Amino acid sequence: MSLHQFLLEPITCHAWNRDRTQIALSPNNHEVHIYKKNGSQWVKAHELKEHNGHITGIDWAPKSDRIVTCGADRNAYVWSQKDGVWKPTLVILRINRAATFVKWSPLENKFAVGSGARLISVCYFESENDWWVSKHIKKPIRSTVLSLDWHPNNVLLAAGSCDFKCRVFSAYIKEVDEKPASTPWGSKMPFGQLMSEFGGSGTGGWVHGVSFSASGSRLAWVSHDSTVSVADASKSVQVSTLKTEFLPLLSVSFVSENSVVAAGHDCCPMLFNYDDRGCLTFVSKLDIPKQSIQRNMSAMERFRNMDKRATTEDRNTALETLHQNSITQVSIYEVDKQDCRKFCTTGIDGAMTIWDFKTLESSIQGLRIM
């Protein structure tokens, strides 16, 4: 595991470039900072300044090398690099509330933006007018959209929202998409078609994170009631929900067809397993706790505590986990959702950690990624 403390401020969101030599992140304001790997150090290479509200989402397209950002100013920008300079192009989202989340489609010919306007803007490039336009998915969303993920077929889109529901929509756009083949989620896919809807019958919570598996037949989501759920379209959309004893999880990703990593307010990533019988189980926390050492306090530390915490007591407030505050995002760092070797987390503590499954398997007894 390698931890890098980028900021004192929270990292709102992050995205990696294709070869993982650069990371784009937002330091909880209206800017995007791009850091470049230089040996073992991360050096700030660019600052993207066009938004005038907090940035809420970043995604970096691996093939076309374009960055898309969205923010509380109700705007989205597509950034392209020319002669070493990042240039923004405004996207017409047509929303009257903050944008909350953005995600490129697998073929990078469109992207989806969630918002507080109770809708999803699916944006694509109109070459005859030379601009990005959007189509809206509105019904039956009843509240802010918090999270999105694309199906590998480039057409289906999963959305988690504050109305306690996780939904799968068709985001088929005839201008840019070929006619999609039938999937286990359904065969008729006109734009905006609701393919599946889960949760919300008097129970549940805000759906903070959603993730399709590499095959696209499974969908995982995490909710504010501390549950993890997986729906399996190949088993006639059977849903397995696991009520955990942890604080709510905020982000989730498949790391193999049967394994899911999620993280949130407990400050450490957790591994869950979904077997072929449709049973969802908690496997392990993926953070090895540091041993706290009892020792005398130096005068320097006593004064520092007076300054920082208005106390001279030796109360160790550091958490035993690597992250010292909630983890807000989990992303794949090495390989893909089919066979993830390393994954990355960023959090409110301003830190970024890269987790290596090989190292974790050797240090946590009985841990195996299925």
UniProtKB/Swiss-Prot annotation:
One of its GO terms (molecular function) is actin binding. Pfam families: WD40. It comes from the Eukaryota. It is found in: Cytoplasm, Cytoskeleton; Nucleus. GO terms for cellular component: actin cytoskeleton; Arp2/3 protein complex; cytosol; extracellular exosome; glutamatergic synapse; muscle cell projection membrane; nucleus; site of double-strand break. Keywords: Actin-binding, Cytoplasm, Cytoskeleton, Nucleus, Repeat, WD repeat. One of its GO terms (biological process) is Arp2/3 complex-mediated actin nucleation. WD repeats lie at residues 6-45, 50-89, 140-179, 202-241, 244-284, 322-365. InterPro entries: ARPC1, WD40/YVTN_repeat-like_dom_sf, WD40_repeat_dom_sf, WD40_rpt. Belongs to the WD repeat ARPC1 family. PANTHER family: ACTIN-RELATED PROTEIN 2/3 COMPLEX SUBUNIT 1, ACTIN-RELATED PROTEIN 2_3 COMPLEX SUBUNIT 1A. Probably functions as a component of the Arp2/3 complex which is involved in regulation of actin polymerization and together with an activating nucleation-promoting factor (NPF) mediates the formation of branched actin networks. Probable component of the Arp2/3 complex in which it may replace ARPC1B. In addition to its role in the cytoplasmic cytoskeleton, the Arp2/3 complex also promotes actin polymerization in the nucleus, thereby regulating gene transcription and repair of damaged DNA. This is Actin-related protein 2/3 complex subunit 1A. It comes from Homo sapiens (Human).
